[in-house]
A protein has these predicted regions:
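Surface-exposed binding patches on compact interaction domains or structured appendages
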Residues: 33-35, 54-82, 123, 144-171
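Sec-dependent bacterial lipoprotein signal peptides
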Residues: 1-18
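Active-site region of glycoside hydrolase catalytic domains
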Residues: 332-475, 484-504, 537-538
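Active-site mouth of glycoside hydrolases
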Residues: 211-213, 217-396, 400-411, 539, ...
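A short beta-strand micro-motif common to beta-rich folds, especially ectodomain repeats
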Residues: 83, 93-106, 180-192
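Bacterial Sec-dependent N-terminal signal peptides
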Residues: 13-40, 105-124, 196-208
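Short, solvent-exposed loop/linker segments at the N-terminal edge
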Residues: 41-45, 130-136
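Aromatic-rich peripheral "rim/lid" segments of glycoside hydrolase catalytic domains that contact
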Residues: 509-578
Length: 578
């Protein structure tokens, strides 16, 4: 802005001088005395600037610098002379100054001339180059700039250091790439002039990854899991995708990074598929929807987190009909959908797991016959995934107990068994836990029967004296007993358990005038803590059900910090028995 001001001032003064009458030079405002129109000049590049002089005789103009030149003054009449000042092109980065002396018979004056250096940002070197290791690593960019800079980088680079100096080195770490080859630009831009920038493009090929870990090993690495709930399982309607229709935002990479920063290292992605079919006769899923799910999986596994993709409720085409007996039409859908899902996601290594269903039989009575139907569809899931080969030939697969109910999953009379799999040690069992349900799920007082109000306070140490909102069942010992059932039935036999969902509903104090808000929040945090700890202590991997109430879906930051703190306390305290 300073340079533009000098130029504007020069033009204004020059116009003022040259518009004077030859017969009345006092109108110029410089009188009969010696006068030079400029005492300071800023030269932009090599563009000349005009100087006007009022003198009794032709002035002499002398520059003290070789790069600074003056033309011979021209006489414009009435004692007015003009000359141009120009400079050689300045290819350096520094600012240089010179002095021009103007002398006539009736006076002398000096003009201070400034020429700014060349503005630039230059990439001096990159280490180890611009082609990155597929398995992850660290890169450095050495650059020089003539001023402070703004820096933009692709989301998959994490800054180690970042400085805005005349010369500096940027360092970034990057994780292994388990998806397609990816490229990203690092752009360094001068803050003072955004048109001046330098760009370096990095490329990272995908790694083949590792598929050697069994289910127990992978489960032991899952510190704390979370669901992207009410998002990818929202059905499409009239060609409009459902993602974001039930929540405040679509999934983005900053949200995923936020989950990792909180301490989660495993993410369950409930998915709808049936409403995304573009050819019903052949059960063909929209390839663009498969790509979108793959994109989210890629964000997760490239953060070195684990991902679970399932077929969720999905309109109930399978889960609501297991009580009707086996259906070849449903079985074909199960086969065709999983063949496409597994094929599209085959490139991901053992960080990705598949879950064949969600809560089979939840909306109908569970009998041994119903269980047999569930088992047939789960066998189809295994066969379809394994048939796609590649990484899927040995990928860990998750099988849902009847209704994902703990008691029904361990009930010997129902005769639930895992499907046959030629690959040993790659199976996990899934259950969900919303106990006590009148604390976690009940939406309205007495909706499930008389004298059944919503409960607000779980854990005896957080009960409120005299309140009918204290939980009267499902306390700590009950939670331990339930997870112990899964430990005895499966974990002790080498089969880890996934707690695919658990959470308690967020209650609005405005709906409960009598609520002790502090005690309620302490209680909810404690429920999160205890469920998480007890699950891990019994060999069950916890995946918290979250739909945007506890965590901001845009930036991945906590909305209910107390709830997240409870989860992390439980994750830290819990120790897997394997």
């Amino acid at each position: 802005m300073i340079r533009l001001s000098y130029i504007a001032l020069s033009l204004a003064l020059a116009l003022g001088f040259t518009s004077c009458s030859d017969d009345d030079y006092n109108e110029c405002g410089i009188g009969n005395d010696f006068k030079v129109s400029r005492s300071e000049i800023a030269l932009a590049a090599s563009a000349p600037q005009t100087v006007t002089v009022r003198a009794a005789s032709a002035p002499a103009v002398v520059s003290d610098s070789e790069w600074l030149h003056a033309t011979t003054p021209a006489h414009n009449g009435a004692g007015i002379y003009t000359f141009d000042l120009a400079a050689d092109e300045h290819t350096g980065y520094d600012t240089r100054t010179g002095i021009v002396t103007v002398t006539a018979s009736n006076g002398s004056s000096q003009i201070s001339v400034t020429q700014y250096g060349h503005e630039t940002v230059e990439i001096l070197s990159t280490t180890p180059g611009t082609t990155l290791e597929p398995t992850g690593g660290t890169l450095s960019i050495h650059y020089a700039a003539t001023g402070d800079v703004d820096i933009t980088v692709p989301h998959w680079l994490d800054a180690v250091t970042s400085k805005s100096l005349t010369e500096s080195t940027l360092s970034y770490t990057y994780n292994a790439n388990y998806s397609e080859t990816r490229t990203g630009d690092v752009v360094i831009t001068l803050k003072s002039d955004p048109s001046v920038s330098a760009t370096v493009t990095f490329t990272q090929d995908a790694t083949e990854g590792v598929m050697t870990s069994d289910a127990k090993t992978i489960a032991s690495r899952m510190y704390a899991g979370i669901n992207i709930g009410n998002t990818m399982e929202c059905p499409a309607s009239n060609g409009v995708w459902g993602e974001g229709q039930w929540t405040t935002a679509k999934v983005n990479v900053n949200y995923i990074k936020g989950l990792k920063a909180m301490g989660f290292n495993a993410v369950r992605i409930p998915c709808a598929w049936d409403s995304y079919v573009i050819d019903a006769a052949n059960n063909t899923i929209d390839p663009a929807w498969l790509d979108r799910v793959s994109e989210i999986v890629g964000w997760i596994v490239n953060e070195d987190m684990y991902a679970i993709v399932n077929i969720h409720w999905d309109g109930g085409w399978l889960e609501n009909h297991v009580g009707d007996g086996y259906s070849s039409t449903i079985d074909r859908k199960q086969h065709d959908y999983w063949t496409q899902i597994a094929t599209r996601l085959n490139k991901y290594d053992e960080h990705l797991l598949f879950a064949g269903m969600n809560e089979p039989g939840m909306n109908g009575g569970i009998t041994s016959s119903t269980v047999q139907t569930i088992m047939k569809y789960q066998q189809t899931f295994v066969d379809a995934v394994r048939a796609t080969g590649g990484n899927n030939a040995v990928r860990c697969l998750i099988h849902q107990g009847p209704e994902t109910n703990i008691d029904k999953t361990v009930d010997a009379s129902l005769q639930y068994k895992l499907p046959v799999d030629n690959v040993t040690g790659r199976a996990l069992v899934e259950i969900h836990n919303y106990d006590p349900s009148n604390y976690t799920l009940l939406e309205e007082d007495n909706a499930w029967g008389p004298n059944m109000p919503i409960k607000l306070y779980w854990g005896s140490k957080f009960h409120v004296a005299g309140s009918d909102r204290n939980c009267d069942w499902g306390q700590e010992d009950f939670i331990d007993q339930q997870y112990k059932k899964m430990q005895d039935a499966y974990v002790s036999k080498g089969i880890p358990v996934i707690v695919g969902e658990y959470s308690s509903m967020i209650r609005n104090p405005a709906d409960f005038p009598e609520m002790d808000v502090e005690r309620y929040e302490q209680s909810r945090a404690y429920w999160n803590e205890y469920q998480t700890m007890s699950a891990k202590n019994h060999g069950c991997v916890p995946f918290y059900w979250e739909t945007g109430g506890d965590i901001n879906r845009t930036n991945g930051k906590a909305l209910k910090q107390y709830a997240i703190d409870g989860l992390m306390r439980g994750a830290s305290a819990g120790v897997y028995p394997f």
